[in-house]
């Protein structure tokens, strides 16, 4: 009997450890962007800060890029090509590089990947809280935030549905009529507007011009609120929810981008189509369909490197203590987190993962968040085949096929060659894969 009790306790401990291993979890809200929890379904990205008082959900849509379709082939390149070769063979690489830049480069270095902005949820009276917890469960691609204000427990559940193409935010409390908040949009774009009407909040904007290339991408994001109990009112660009029992917020975004030659779509109609369909389903249906579709890909690979009690510690502590070598399960977590990020940023029919994956808070991201095809794009996709995620490769292969078309003119114009060429970088509006300085 005594041995049975010991065995049972060890079994429970093992189960507890295993349950925590594929979660990133924290005992405090994110204080900066890199600490927020990333959600994504390839088309939409969201960074969840998890602040009880002022929740910020930074949003991305994969086709929000500055500038417009363009070419920057430079016909002067061919005229100096022979001299550049001679200089290189003579060991004068710096002189060759200078000559090449003067005659092959143009003012355009590619267009930048840009943020949509943020959806903000302001919860009056939630400045002081206890029992805080937030996590990202990478087995089901769902983020959770929970905390107490007084003796009321609040839970937020968030996911970007792979099945229904929307961000779902579900708010609960263990006391009736306890949910009250204001919802608003913010965006860094100068040309933008926010309209609140009934239960719908709409952000419309135009991406920015870049390097003398005018802006062409228009975007729209909508948040629609559905409550159980309470009421929803609109006021001065905000939606105000009071005395609700349960709230579900449906969020999506779209642009006018069709392909690298065509930006004629209606972004507003696209969002309406998505959210009209989402609104026909219950929260449970949305959650179940999302998890089911995600696990079809994620669940193909298991990795077990061993377990330890370190798995019960929050993620920042595990990372700090990892050098002690007593947390093999953290390696498993990081391996599976890499697969999670690729699933979340690259799906068939969408765009490839860029330098930011799909998550970016800037108008000018580091290196513009482009597809740096001399190594970084390849590195993004190293896990695709060897970790059994072959469908994530489809956007990359489509990019290569389109570069093969646009690169024909580059090869002819700059090198007087047949075939096609691409240099070390490209972007969504990649009608010209010409040389760039970054």
Enumerate the predicted regions with their spans:
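Low-complexity, intrinsically disordered/propeptide-like segments
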Residues: 11-14, 312, 431
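Bacterial Sec-dependent N-terminal signal peptides
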Residues: 1-20
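Conserved small/polar residues in nucleotide/adenosyl-binding loops
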Residues: 430-437
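Aromatic-residue-lined binding/catalytic grooves and analogous aromatic/hydrophobic interfacial grooves
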Residues: 20-429
